[in-house]
């Protein structure tokens, strides 16, 4: 069974997934970040593939991607770095990146490399669901790579149900239609969106991302889904500390989490 399915199989709550950009802050630090996050009890990790035009991301992640590219990170190098990661890392790993570099690499080759490295899923924010269905789904399923689709408050109920029916892993609930970045709390409109999706009784578990930056937003996400995805706040801490151990320790303090709260 795919590790994403294994994670959600027992209907867990309060899951923490962390996003970081491969090759940032240092080119060779990718596997160190992964191992450090797992050691601290993080349940799932999203590894960002740096791209020059990350349209769904705010300035924090854009700047990290720019620096990672300057450092020399590429998709080919990332797969080389991840080749032996499954010798000791057990939690689900997901690659998150834009369609352009993945298509240049070749989608079949990309999925094959994911399978060989033990990557469990992929998030491609600019992949239309129709294109996924017609051109990508068969290839991804051949390699047991879960393609995680995003929904926003603007996504129609019909499309949400289509995504729920034709994907298998989890649904990424974007907290707003804006780019990634910190929010102090979720307003009534966002909370109504969470409740609307909850009432749809979807078969797939849900994770909330975009804007999770403190204990209030983390708890609100966990109340309305299986857990939260944190990106910009962790990348900011990684920028400040230049050390994944210190960065995740600070993040857990901000979220008021101990290692016992995770897993």
UniProtKB/Swiss-Prot annotation:
HAMAP family hit by this protein: Trp_synth_alpha
Top-level taxon of origin: Bacteria
SUPFAM superfamilies xrefs: Ribulose-phoshate binding barrel
Catalytic activity: (1S,2R)-1-C-(indol-3-yl)glycerol 3-phosphate + L-serine = D-glyceraldehyde 3-phosphate + L-tryptophan + H2O
Record protein name field: Tryptophan synthase alpha chain
Gene name of this polypeptide: trpA
Family the entry assigns: Belongs to the TrpA family.
Subunit and partners: Tetramer of two alpha and two beta chains.
Catalytic site: 46, 57
EC number: 4.2.1.20
GO cellular component: cytosol
Keyword Amino-acid biosynthesis applies: yes
Taxonomic lineage from the root: Bacteria, Pseudomonadati, Bacteroidota, Bacteroidia, Bacteroidales
Record carries keyword Membrane: no
Cysteine-cysteine disulfides: none
Pathway, per record: Amino-acid biosynthesis; L-tryptophan biosynthesis; L-tryptophan from chorismate: step 5/5
Alphabetized UniProt keyword annotations: Amino-acid biosynthesis, Aromatic amino acid biosynthesis, Lyase, Tryptophan biosynthesis
Function summary: The alpha subunit is responsible for the aldol cleavage of indoleglycerol phosphate to indole and glyceraldehyde 3-phosphate.
MF term (GO), any: tryptophan synthase activity
């Amino acid at each position: 069974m795919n590790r994403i399915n294994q994670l959600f199989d027992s209907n867990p709550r309060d899951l923490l997934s962390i996003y970081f950009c491969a090759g940032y802050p240092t080119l060779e630090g990718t596997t160190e970040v992964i191992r450090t996050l797992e050691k601290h009890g993080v349940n799932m990790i999203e590894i960002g593939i740096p791209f020059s035009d990350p349209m769904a991301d705010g300035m924090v992640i854009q700047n990290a991607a720019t620096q990672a590219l300057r450092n020399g990170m590429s998709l080919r190098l990332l797969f080389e770095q991840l080749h032996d990661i499954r010798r000791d890392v057990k939690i689900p790993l997901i690659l998150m990146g834009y369609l352009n570099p993945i298509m240049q690499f070749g989608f079949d080759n990309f999925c094959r490399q994911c399978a060989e490295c033990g990557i469990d899923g992929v998030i491609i924010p600019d992949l239309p669901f129709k294109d996924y269905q017609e051109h990508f789904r068969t290839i991804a399923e051949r390699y047991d790579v879960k393609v995680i689709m995003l929904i926003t408050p603007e996504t129609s109920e019909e499309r949400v149900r289509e995504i729920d029916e034709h994907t298998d892993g989890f649904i990424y609930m974007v907290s707003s239609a804006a780019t990634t970045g910190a929010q102090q709390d979720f307003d009534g409109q966002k909370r109504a969106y969470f409740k609307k999706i909850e009432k749809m009784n979807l078969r797939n578990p849900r994770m909330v991302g975009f804007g999770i930056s403190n204990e209030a937003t983390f708890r609100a996400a966990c109340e309305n889904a299986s857990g939260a995805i944190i990106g910009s706040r962790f990348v900011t801490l990684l920028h400040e500390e230049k050390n994944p151990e210190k960065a995740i320790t600070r993040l857990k303090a901000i979220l008021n989490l101990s290692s016992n709260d995770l897993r």
